[in-house]
UniProtKB/Swiss-Prot annotation:
Active site: 183
Gene3D superfamilies registered for this protein in UniProt: Vaccinia Virus protein VP39
EC code(s) of this entry: 2.1.1.166
Name of this protein: Ribosomal RNA large subunit methyltransferase E
UniProt-listed Pfam families: FtsJ (PF01728)
GO MF annotation terms: rRNA (uridine-2'-O-)-methyltransferase activity
Catalytic activity: uridine(2552) in 23S rRNA + S-adenosyl-L-methionine = 2'-O-methyluridine(2552) in 23S rRNA + S-adenosyl-L-homocysteine + H(+)
GO CC annotations on file: cytoplasm
Binding positions for S-adenosyl-L-methionine per the UniProt entry: 78, 80, 103, 119, 143
Amino acid sequence: MTNNLSGYRNKFVRVKTSRKRTVSSNNWLRRQLNDPYVAKARTQGFRSRAAYKLLEIHEKFKLFTPNMKIVDLGAAPGGWSQIASKLIKASDNSLNNKIISIDLLEIRPIVGVEFFQKDFFEEDTEKLIIQALDGKANIVMSDMASNTIGHKATDHIRTLLLCEQALEFALKVLKPSGHFIAKIFRGGAENKLLNKVKHEFRTVKHFKPLSSRSESTEIYLVALNKK
């Protein structure tokens, strides 16, 4: 699994406007049709281009090894769970080498992944995850983001709140020396969150994968070795 895009950069595809589509929908479709990572994901059988973001994070920080328990928050359509399953060599009958995935949207089965179609913020979901883990997690990862509205400050705050919730959960279920990965949007309000993360983990890094669109303000918070 590599991020080499040779052969995936196609000739620019124009999108015909339609009265049934909004301007933002047309822009999204144009990006999708001309995105080499979308084409590569389709060819290699990954659920989404986000799979390459996690792969790049792993290549940079060497996070995943066999015999891990992982929680994937906001998992649909399953790109991150797919990558994690391959990296830890997960299997459906292993108790100590598995991934627990949560999302409101359904995802198709993935080897070694136990999926719950639940709202992460419902009161009983946390108990359900903890029960399924049957112990502490090595990694909690979250690619959750709120539905963007195009207002950068609002999108920043909404996704930051999701990250804060994911962090609170991670601190409950991670083993000592466990890792936390989460998406945030840059915007200036993240300092309080970063200070808390730095207090709880030995190493905290920001990382923007090459597979993250250049115009996007998203970055990934990579917190290593929980104290």
